[in-house]
């Protein structure tokens, strides 16, 4: 124990000491006054040295006599710079003074001396700055950050020698911790040596910075020469979404959370290598809804929030490996900060004091109900609880949630002494209504000690108890020398009267000295006192043997010493009535143990067993594993685990005791759970309704417990059906309610709302397991607008848009918005006359959780049709007007995009864009995309740090099309990505991004635009991009069809042409928009229906195609059009005929290479849809349709197709993260079709994909992205055309005629920290690319920003003086020397020609290889002499490109072609007109004049 008391607040100054020498019958009290409040006060363990920090002026104080006298720590450079004062948690000699900058100080001798150390970073703004090793105090990590302008990176440093040297561990680590973080970690285990060096770090995802992509890495080499190894948390597989890790006793826990759920998964290890997922007896564990409590060396204690209230929990205790948790007590009292009324009595095993909520049912129904809190105590480690008793009355004590002192609330190492403030009666009253109570038998019996609330502390192993009045100001202290039976008072000297803030003593409570911190009013503000209370001078005698008793720490119901963990516990403590002091300073009382015979309580459930419903038996949690070769038949028997094991660390006596872990005979049938049937299983269900109106999956996410696959359906008869097993069995729900619509939560897959027309509603938070009713403030609106708006991060926050004054009599019917933060428990008015209100996500914006945008009719008058866009961060107590007269707004990942009408009806729409939700900027649209009047935008997608918009060009019915424009990274500057993209009358466009792989998208364009403008029907072609819309190409058709025949058209050299390409039916033709080409879990695979030819043909003539390499190559799998669905992350693909009655389906187990027929119905069915869970990870599929053949049954039918029993999919695939290609998986690298080096977005990524020939299943969602390998050099594919530039037929970018690029100097004004600006080149980097070096097409000619010349030239040093002289001279000298040598040694000399000679074959013969270089160099002499004036000119102009030089060129032409640029190095700053000649690239001169006229680069 180091820090038992932590103070909150200010500092000190002034040091005026008053000393009052008390009589022998009272303590000596010394008072020191300070101007500012002390903070971070702590004792060095086993010493009288105390320190605290003046948080106001940055000084640190130290006392070496337990607080009687104080000195400022005066080390060179430290005064006034202390930002925090931190004791080492396990080393009693060390402490750290941290400054805000990079200089800090450490002491290793209890503040006698200090040593300075520096780190090249500021302290972390989000984490505790130091992370300590549990066993080696010299090993510490420091968490900091370093900023370069607005770009800040988290940095983690480490030391292994107590900060004598400091090393960088990693950048951008979100949280790092030592594996050995506690002194007890690994006790009793033979851990490998490398675990002592092991570090765990939570880092961002490879492709995403969102929390759900976080990874947990470890390294045994401080991440030297490695990126770390991903921790296999779940059965050998890595898990994404790691929030953080925590160490408690001998356990390390890791919490993970998947996207779209609040539910967490907790993983635990006790050896830093093998991890297990924890199970909480069927209870959900949610984010910010659990608290890891003080635990033991043999179990973890965790309090988990109850389902519907954040301030009521359930206490769980784990088995010895932390895997299985059982409920101890329900309805524990918590507060909104996660503190729980729970405390273990210090130094005594098994005694726990908790507070619970008596009226929990009422509290869960309404947040306005006041909790009635009662106290309970357990003497058997939480198995049973009983009330606290003062005589016959129940006692209730204030606990952790409203603690008023630092350190423990009730107890200390003083054996058996427990105190608290509370009251007797039915429940706990206010703190100020409480009295002080004491128990000296560890909580069995209690008595009142003092009237009114007091702070209290124990000293001299309980011989002395000190208390101070805590309901107001006081000038006295109280103390007891007989376990709180009798009390005495002592006055503070010189009339000092204070409001007590902290009463504390040295850790261990073994000294006779106490410290009291208090405040008092001063002439100006407040003043503070530290009061030293010393009982040593009372001159009591030292206790002798007769003054002690052998006290049993725990008693059972018979008042006999009780056993726990196989032993009884006793303490030798001073008798209450003894008139003596123990005086064993810094020597804590040691317990004595007496072993007991083993009982049932000494055993726990063995691995793979859990407690049965009776709470006594242990039943298998999964199928048992029999010895090899034993179980040949289900009826065979084998000897296996009884289900029990002795709790590790338990020392009970086996002989004569209970023996629950004795092996027992088991039946082999227990080793098979759901034995594979070897075939596909079908379950068909019928409904009275004719068809379904809609269905929704409430998908269980990776971090969610359970095995359910929940589907909810609403039928044409308004019936609601629920299935928890993917449609095998259905049950009707909410039968008595008139449900008119179902609203699944947009952001949380566990949640759905069921609404009626009168404002009543129901919701589920657990995927239909339970339902709860709510009442809305108004009926749903009548404007066909969304009724509910959901918060992206806060599950319980809603906005309800209801109808007001809509009584059917004309009236003033309008929509009004209300909000709730507790699932409709309480509603609050937000705004009237609204069209729509939305919560805005804060993740990418750093804004408030309360950021809300609303569209409101101007002047609250719907008739004028003018909508204004308003926002608020305080529920419209204050509001901000962004735009008037808007058309609509949309939110998409990073961007908020607004369509604004012009002032006149003839004006085109404008676009406003914001990233932070506060500041909007007008978007710069490409001039070659004209937006006609009253025509719309469609916001397509923005997951790749750029917004895609479809801008309507032709809005005539059945002739609609438009252009896709793409933004830069802040959404303000748009360029044309693709023209003539098809859309329909509802505004939907034929555009779809591939799921699971960034940057790949497909779109259907109108191929006959000129004809369409004249009234002809549209003809479509399919285009694909592999670099996020920078370049589009037609799709390459297969070489042969599914029957092995060639197509009627042919490609050109394997490349698609206008006359021969693959075209697929797209978004606008789908009956269900959820039926996408691709799946997020089947990486690289897409399926579509279409044809090969010049245009897309009718859908009735379509065939079905597949790609396995993200659209580079395609294969026809079947003639005709099919509906498709992916299962088990693509290891199962199912096809069913579309629009054709059938009783069979097709399935593939090898990514579509081969197909098998399966008959799922005896009667032909018309299948309307095929579905599975949205992640496509299930082995179950659901067909929706009707029977139409002979013997048909009426009504809607669903057919569940279950592949989990199929032999080929009955065994789970093996993935070894260290050897990802060793077993059932291989690493697949996506490629760009136009890049030979395999790079995509500037890097090579590798994805886990199951080997098609392996007979196994993937299981729950696989973390597909394995690694990002080499970072590639930049190429043309990493760039797109800049604003006012457009792509040419050869792929280059040329400026649109008559238009100018954006002012490049704006970067200097928009970013005050910018150092330079670059001349426009026509290119800009794709926001998604990670490339480095190579072609810098966007950064060629640089100029300094105003007043940034000095920083600019540090970044770009100039060549001048002697350096410039030698650059010119050295090539001339080398060429001249070589020429002279060749002239004097070559036998031919210049001008000598000999006909008919065969040559001497000498070293310097003309044919000698060695002559070729000197000849070139001689030729170079002439070239250099000729080029010298040009070289000097070029160098001069290069220098003048940086600064103004008299006579320097004021302008230069850009590179004239991509090829001429490629011939030069990217580190040239300027190039003169004749430099191509100098560098030998005159072969491009023919192109330059024309290219320059076109503005082509």
From Swiss-Prot:
Cytoplasmic side: 1383-1408
Compartments (UniProt record): Golgi apparatus, trans-Golgi network membrane; Prevacuolar compartment membrane
Membrane disposition: Multi-pass membrane protein
Transmembrane stretches, start-end: 1362-1382, 1409-1429
Classification via CDD domains: Sialidase_non-viral
Lumenal side: 22-1361, 1430-1497
Stored InterPro entries: Sortilin_C (IPR031777), Sortilin_N (IPR031778), VPS10 (IPR006581), VPS10-sortilin (IPR050310), WD40/YVTN_repeat-like_dom_sf (IPR015943)
Residue stretches of biased makeup (Acidic residues): 1474-1491
Glycosylation sites: 321, 970
Cellular component GO terms, alphabetical: cytosol; Golgi apparatus; membrane
Keywords linked to the UniProt accession: Glycoprotein, Golgi apparatus, Membrane, Protein transport, Receptor, Repeat, Signal, Transmembrane, Transmembrane helix, Transport
Recorded family membership: Belongs to the VPS10-related sortilin family.
Function: Functions as a sorting receptor in the Golgi compartment required for the intracellular sorting and delivery of soluble vacuolar proteins, like carboxypeptidase Y (CPY) and proteinase A. Executes multiple rounds of sorting by cycling between the late Golgi and a prevacuolar endosome-like compartment.
This protein's name: Vacuolar protein sorting/targeting protein 10
Gene this chain is encoded by: VPS10
């Amino acid at each position: 124990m180091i820090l038992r008391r932590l103070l909150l607040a200010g500092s000190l100054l002034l040091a005026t000491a008053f000393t009052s020498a008390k009589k022998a019958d009272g303590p000596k009290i010394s008072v020191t006054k300070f101007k500012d409040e002390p903070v971070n006060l702590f004792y060095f363990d086993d010493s009288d040295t105390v320190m605290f920090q003046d948080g106001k002026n940055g000084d640190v104080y130290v006392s070496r006599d337990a607080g009687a006298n104080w000195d400022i720590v005066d080390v060179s450079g430290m005064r006034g710079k202390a930002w925090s004062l931190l004791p080492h948690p396990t080393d009693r000699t060390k402490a750290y003074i941290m400054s805000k900058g990079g200089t800090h100080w450490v002491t290793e001798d209890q503040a006698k001396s200090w040593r300075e150390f520096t780190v090249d970073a500021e302290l972390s703004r989000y984490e505790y700055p130091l992370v300590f090793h549990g066993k080696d105090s010299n090993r510490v990590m420091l968490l900091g950050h370093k900023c370069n302008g607005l770009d800040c990176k988290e940095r983690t440093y480490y030391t292994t020698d107590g900060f004598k040297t400091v090393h960088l561990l990693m950048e951008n680590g979100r949280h790092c911790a030592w594996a050995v973080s506690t002194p007890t970690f690994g006790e009793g285990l033979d851990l490998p040596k490398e675990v002592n060096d092991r570090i765990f770090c939570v880092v961002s995802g490879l492709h995403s910075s969102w929390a759900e992509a976080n990874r947990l890495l470890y390294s045994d080499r401080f991440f030297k020469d490695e990126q770390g190894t991903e921790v296999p948390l779940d059965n050998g597989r890595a898990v994404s979404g790691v929030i953080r890790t925590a160490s408690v006793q001998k356990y390390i826990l890791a919490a993970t959370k998947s996207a779209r759920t609040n539910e967490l998964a907790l993983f635990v290890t006790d050896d830093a290598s093998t991890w297990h997922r924890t199970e909480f007896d069927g209870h959900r564990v949610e984010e910010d809804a659990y608290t890891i409590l003080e635990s033991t060396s043999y179990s973890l204690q965790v309090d988990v929030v109850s389902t519907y209230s954040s301030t009521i929990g359930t206490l769980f205790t784990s088995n010895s490996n932390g895997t299985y948790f059982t409920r101890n007590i329900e309805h524990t009292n918590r507060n909104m900060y996660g503190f729980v009324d729970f405390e273990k009595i210090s130094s005594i095993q098994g005694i726990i004091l908790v507070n619970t909520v008596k009226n929990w049912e009422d509290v869960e129904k309404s947040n306005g109900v006041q909790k009635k809190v009662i106290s309970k105590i357990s003497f058997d480690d939480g198995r049973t609880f009983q009330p606290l008793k003062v005589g016959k009355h129940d006692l209730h004590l204030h606990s952790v949630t409203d603690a008023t002192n630092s350190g423990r609330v009730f107890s200390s190492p003083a054996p058996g002494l427990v105190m608290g403030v509370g009251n007797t009666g039915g429940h706990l009253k206010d703190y100020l209504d409480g009295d002080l109570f004491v128990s000296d038998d560890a909580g069995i019996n209690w008595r009142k000690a003092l009237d009114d609330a007091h702070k209290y502390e124990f000293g001299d192993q309980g011989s002395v108890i000190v208390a101070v009045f805590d309901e107001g100001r006081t000038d006295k202290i109280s103390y007891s020398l007989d376990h709180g039976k009798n009390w005495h008072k002592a006055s503070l000297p010189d009339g000092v009267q204070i409001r007590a803030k902290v009463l504390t003593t040295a850790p261990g409570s073994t000294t006779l000295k106490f410290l009291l911190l208090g405040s008092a009013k001063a002439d100006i503000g407040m003043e503070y006192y530290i009061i030293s209370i010393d009982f040593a001078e009372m001159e009591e005698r030292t206790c002798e043997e007769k003054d002690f008793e052998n006290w049993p720490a725990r008693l059972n119901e018979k008042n006999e010493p009780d056993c726990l963990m196989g032993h009884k516990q006793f303490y030798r403590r001073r008798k209450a009535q003894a008139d003596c002091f123990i005086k064993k300073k810094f020597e804590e009382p040691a317990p004595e143990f007496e072993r007991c015979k083993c009982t049932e309580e000494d055993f726990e459930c063995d691995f793979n067993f859990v407690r049965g419903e009776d709470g006594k038996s242990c039943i298998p949690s999964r199928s048992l594993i029999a010895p090899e070769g034993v179980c040949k038949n289900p009826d065979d028997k084998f000897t296996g685990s009884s289900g029990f094991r002795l709790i590790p660390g338990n020392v009970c006596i086996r002989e004569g005791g209970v023996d629950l872990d004795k092996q027992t005979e088991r039946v082999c049938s227990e080793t098979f759970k759901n034995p594979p049937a070897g075939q596909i299983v079908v379950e068909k269900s019928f409904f009275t309704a004719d068809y379904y109106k809609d269905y929704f999956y409430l998908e269980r996410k990776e971090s969610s417990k359970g095995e359910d696959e929940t589907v909810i359906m609403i039928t044409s008869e308004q019936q609601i059906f629920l299935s928890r097993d993917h449609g095998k069995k259905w049950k009707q729900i909410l039968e008595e309610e008139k449900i008119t619509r179902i609203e699944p939560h947009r952001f949380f897959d566990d949640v759905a709302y069921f609404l009626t027309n009168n404002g009543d509603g129901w919701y589920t938070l657990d995927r239909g397991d339970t339902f709860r009713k709510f009442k809305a403030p108004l009926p749903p609106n009548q404007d066909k607008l969304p009724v509910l708006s959901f918060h992206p991060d806060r599950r319980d926050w809603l906005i309800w848009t209801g109808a007001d004054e809509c009584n059917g009599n004309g009236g003033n019917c309008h929509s009004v918005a209300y909000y709730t933060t507790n699932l409709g428990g309480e509603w609050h008015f937000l705004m009237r006359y609204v069209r729509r209100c939305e919560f805005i996500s804060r993740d990418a914006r750093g804004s408030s959780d309360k950021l809300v945008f609303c569209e409101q009719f101007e002047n609250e008058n719907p008739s004028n049709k003018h909508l204004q866009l308003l926002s608020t961060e305080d529920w419209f107590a204050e509001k901000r007007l962004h735009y008037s007269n808007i058309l609509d707004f949309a939110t998409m990942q990073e961007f908020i995009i607004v369509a604004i009408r012009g002032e006149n009806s003839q004006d085109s729409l404008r676009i406003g864009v914001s990233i932070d939700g506060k500041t909007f900027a007008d978007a710069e649209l490409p001039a070659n995309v004209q937006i006609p009047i009253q025509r719309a935008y469609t916001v397509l997608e923005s997951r790749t740090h750029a917004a895609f918009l479809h801008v309507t060009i032709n809005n005539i019915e059945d002739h609609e099309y438009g252009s896709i424009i793409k933004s830069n990274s802040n959404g303000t500057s748009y360029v044309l990505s693709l023209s003539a993209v098809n859309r329909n009358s509802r505004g939907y466009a034929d555009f779809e991004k591939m799921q699971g792989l960034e940057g790949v998208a497909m779109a259907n364009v109108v191929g006959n635009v000129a004809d369409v403008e004249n009234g002809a029907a549209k003809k479509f072609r399919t285009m694909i991009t592999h670099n996020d819309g920078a370049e589009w190409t037609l799709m390459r058709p297969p070489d042969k069809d599914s029957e092995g025949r060639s197509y009627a058209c042919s490609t050109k050299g394997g490349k698609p042409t206008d006359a021969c390409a693959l075209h697929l039916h797209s978004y606008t033709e789908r009956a269900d928009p959820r039926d996408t080409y691709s799946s997020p879990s089947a990486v690289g695979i897409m399926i579509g229906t279409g044809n090969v030819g010049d245009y897309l043909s009718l859908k009735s003539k379509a065939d079905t195609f597949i790609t396995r390499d993200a659209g580079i190559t395609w294969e026809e799998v079947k003639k005709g059009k099919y509906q498709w669905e992916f299962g088990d992350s693509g290891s199962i693909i199912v096809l069913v005929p579309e629009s054709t009655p059938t009783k069979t389906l097709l399935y593939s187990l090898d990514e579509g290479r081969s197909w098998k027929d399966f008959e799922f119905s005896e009667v032909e069915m018309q299948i309307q849809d095929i579905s599975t869970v949205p992640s496509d990870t299930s082995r179950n599929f659901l067909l929706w349709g009707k029977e139409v053949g002979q013997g048909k049954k009426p009504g809607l039918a669903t057919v569940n197709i279950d592949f989990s029993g199929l032999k080929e999919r009955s065994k789970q695939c093996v993935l070894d993260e260290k050897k990802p290609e060793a077993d059932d998986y291989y690493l697949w690298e996506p490629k760009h079709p136009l890049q030979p080096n395999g790079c995509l977005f500037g890097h090579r990524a590798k994805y886990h994909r199951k080997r098609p020939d392996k007979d196994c299943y993937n299981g729950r969602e696989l973390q597909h992205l394995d690694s990002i390998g080499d970072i590639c050099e930049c190429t043309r594919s990493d760039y797109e055309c800049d604003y006012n530039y457009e792509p040419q037929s050869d792929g280059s970018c040329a400026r649109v005629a008559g238009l100018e690029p954006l002012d490049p100097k704006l970067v200097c004004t928009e970013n005050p920290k910018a150092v330079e600006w670059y001349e426009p080149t026509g290119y800009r980097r794709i926001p998604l690319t990670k490339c480095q070096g190579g072609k810098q097409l966007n950064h060629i000619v640089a100029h300094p920003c105003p007043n940034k010349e000095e920083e600019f030239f540090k970044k770009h040093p100039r060549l001048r003086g002697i350096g410039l002289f030698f650059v010119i001279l050295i090539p001339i000298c080398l060429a001249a020397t070589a020429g002279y040598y060749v002239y004097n040694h070559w036998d031919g000399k210049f001008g000598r020609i000999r006909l008919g000679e065969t040559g001497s074959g000498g070293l310097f013969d003309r044919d000698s290889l060695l002559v070729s270089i000197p000849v070139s160099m001689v030729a170079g002499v002439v070239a250099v002499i000729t080029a010298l004036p040009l070289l000097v000119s070029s160098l001069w102009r290069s220098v003048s490109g940086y600064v103004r030089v008299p006579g320097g060129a004021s302008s230069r032409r850009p590179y004239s072609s991509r090829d001429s640029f490629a011939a030069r190095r990217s580190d040239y700053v300027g190039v003169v007109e004749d430099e191509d000649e100098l560098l030998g690239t005159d072969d491009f001169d023919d192109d330059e004049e024309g290219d320059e006229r076109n503005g082509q680069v």
